[in-house]
Amino acid sequence: MTEDNALTDGGLSDEAQAVIDEIEEKNVDFLRLQFTDILGTVKNVSIPASQAEKAFTEGIYFDGSSIDGFVRIQESDMRLEPDPSTFAVLPWRKKENSAAGRLICDVFNTSTGEPFSGDPRGVLKRAIERAEELGYDVNVAPEPEFFLFEEDEDGRATTVTNDAGGYFDLAPKDLASDVRRDIIYGLESMGFDIEASHHEVAEGQHEINFTYDDALSTADNVATFRSVVRAIAAEHDLHATFMPKPIPRINGSGMHTHISLFKDGENAFHDGDDEFDLSDTAKSFVAGILDHAPAITAVADPTVNSYKRLVPGYEAPVYIAWSDRNRSALIRKPAARTPAASRIEARFPDPSCNPYLAFAALIHAGLDGVEKGLDCPDPVRENIYEFDEAKREEYGIETLPKDLGGAVDALEEDEVIQEALGDHVFEKFVEAKRSEFKDYLVDVSQWELDRYLETF
């Protein structure tokens, strides 16, 4: 992550010049300038590599009114400024002896010259700045899960999984090991540090873990990860999806998100004298996330389908609690081999989220707990799924919203998470999600037809 933009008054920064040199060295002939809209969809404009210097010194202009959640047509001129630290060569070639590169961009208003308040990457930058004002650096490590499905004869996605494997299975049950290997090769060529990959619990479900990094670089990596997984799966005639629950009555896909704060180079979450090896800072950070969890859910689990995953019985968290060992809790404190690895794991985000907005919401919520010195409730070490309502009330355990509408209601009542998003993103996000939930409510599903059409 760079401190400053590469855009200068006619000259190139050293980092931008290094990218120009690498473009020439690696025979890159096209560049994809990438950014993300409010809903988390990656957008891009392609330019010839010969225009790279101009992109760095002048930016690339585009019509922001055509991007969901950006601006109205009468204020539509926007400018992309590439971040040179994000340059990577894409792991596929359209022809021999040439390559395409990728740069992630920040979005600016042309009228004011200021960062665009609706740019999700800018939203996360503001959250990081808030942490830095308190003396903290934020590290994040996500675990995005995905499904691989067969394509039909027309190349369209089906819900037929490409294998019948289960958790940690090997071939022949796991038929996607070669696909995962190719994905890993592609990711590594783009600078990812891969820790492990494996078949997940559900048929056709997979996970590839990459190491933690600062929050902005990690959000960039999530956006890149999803694009690379889809592209390489397609080369194997498979469709990769990060939809949280594509098949009913089996485990859905989550994106467990590990977070830690560092201060002066030391892990601020570690306290070796504590029963759980957690500092007061860590406990207050956990308390902040628990306090704002209903509102965060709207951002971290942003689709109607997300709430088909967030039900008891399929290893997805539903109850607002934390534990040092229990995976039925919303937040878990994983075992750490070293003090530097101390962290907390938020288990409720899913991979359909906009990573920039989800990380920003989690950071703001946690820091709110730290600033207020919130007390963390006692950990719950029992299986919360087995609690009845009376026992949950005894423990003071509340539940996450049961649907997208309830989550958006919670977001509209939570000033901290609204502040995390900023006025523009909050307004446009709520507008989009209200519309999505309304569309869902008026639709008639196949389940309803199967259940009622011949009964009544």
UniProtKB/Swiss-Prot annotation:
Biological process according to GO:
glutamine biosynthetic process
Residues that, per the record, bind L-glutamate: N251, G252, R309, E315, R327, R347
Name the Enzyme Commission number(s) assigned to this protein.
6.3.1.2
Per the record's keyword annotation, is ATP-binding included, yes or no?
yes
Q: Where does the UniProt annotation locate this protein?
A: Cytoplasm
Residues noted as binding Mg(2+) 2 in the record, renumbered to the chain: E145, E200, E207
One cellular-component annotation, GO: cytoplasm
**Positions of the site: Important for inhibition by glutamine?**
R72
Domain spans labelled GS catalytic: 120-456
Q: Which cofactor does it need?
A: Mg(2+)
**Which residues bind Mg(2+) 1 per the record?**
E143, H256, E345
Which residues does the annotation say bind ATP? E195, H258, I259, S260, R327, R332
Per the record, the coiled-coil ranges are none
Activity modulation: Inhibited by glutamine.
Quaternary structure and partners: Oligomer of 12 subunits arranged in the form of two hexagons. In its feedback-inhibited form, interacts with TnrA in order to block its DNA-binding activity.
Any idea what job this protein has? Glutamine synthetase (GS) is an unusual multitasking protein that functions as an enzyme, a transcription coregulator, and a chaperone in ammonium assimilation and in the regulation of genes involved in nitrogen metabolism. It catalyzes the ATP-dependent biosynthesis of glutamine from glutamate and ammonia. Feedback-inhibited GlnA also interacts with and regulates the activity of the transcriptional regulator TnrA. During nitrogen limitation, TnrA is in its DNA-binding active state and turns on the transcription of genes required for nitrogen assimilation.
- Recorded protein name is Glutamine synthetase
Q: Whose protein is this, by species?
A: Haloferax volcanii (strain ATCC 29605 / DSM 3757 / JCM 8879 / NBRC 14742 / NCIMB 2012 / VKM B-1768 / DS2)
